[in-house]
Amino acid sequence: MDIIQAIIIGIIEGFTEFLPISSTGHMIVASKFLGVAETDLTKAYEVIIQFAAILAVMLIYREKITFKKIDLWMKLLFAFLPLAIVGFIFKDQVKALFNVQVVAWMFIIGGIIFLIVEYYYKEQAWHVKDVEKVSWTQAWWVGFAQIFSLIPGTSRAGATIIGGLLAGLDRKTSAEFSFLLAIPVMAVVSGYDLLKHYQDFADANWGAFLIGFIVAFIVAYATIKLFLVFLQRFTFVAFGIYRIIFGIFLLMIL
């Protein structure tokens, strides 16, 4: 992987990881057009840029990553449990699901679900507007929704945001809870992948890896900030439409 490829993939990871559009499908397209083979080394690089994305969230929400916010973090860990349990038990079945057809169709299905939810969703005065006021029950339902992100192409952000909306959170709080929930999820997943691929770093182009890490961090940081501004004025309809179009595009080219 050269520096240009590392930068482009870093941009895609940073931009798509926290939006409800699934980074998986975009990585597939990027790898195809960039001619990047799916090797252990590229998987190792993906681990590096995922850590960059985690750091972006931690920097933005650094005031919430303290012992004073222990109640919030207990709820986030509680929400993480369904995914951890189901993912561990059915890891082989989940791995068998990974193919482009599944990814494409989950883009389309996820897009349709977003459009349906937004058609009926109306923000109410009783909706939770502060991520620290999310209840244990609401945290559980967001965590339950996250299970569906085990299906490739679903989008972890998309599943948790939908779960948040259905559980009674407003749009911004749904997104913020999703961002924070990404920290334990991605830390565990990326940590596991790091242990699996640490030997592959011996052959790494560290210059490309470092630049990709920095790019992914900057893009993820900017994307989260802009996404929150976007949600103050708009709904998730645009993401639903985009998912459907991108899913059809995937079916046509791959």
Curated annotation (Swiss-Prot):
Its main location: membrane. One of its GO terms (biological process) is cell wall organization. It is found in: Cell inner membrane. It is a multi-pass membrane protein. Signal peptide: none annotated. It holds the Pfam family BacA. The chain crosses the membrane at residues 1-21, 41-61, 70-90, 97-117, 134-154, 175-195, 209-229, 234-254. Its EC number is 3.6.1.27. GO terms for cellular component: plasma membrane. GO terms for molecular function: undecaprenyl-diphosphatase activity. It catalyses: di-trans,octa-cis-undecaprenyl diphosphate + H2O = di-trans,octa-cis-undecaprenyl phosphate + phosphate + H(+). Keywords: Antibiotic resistance, Cell inner membrane, Cell membrane, Cell shape, Cell wall biogenesis/degradation, Hydrolase, Membrane, Peptidoglycan synthesis, Transmembrane, Transmembrane helix. Bacitracin is thought to be involved in the inhibition of peptidoglycan synthesis by sequestering undecaprenyl diphosphate, thereby reducing the pool of lipid carrier available. Catalyzes the dephosphorylation of undecaprenyl diphosphate (UPP). Confers resistance to bacitracin. Belongs to the UppP family. This is Undecaprenyl-diphosphatase.
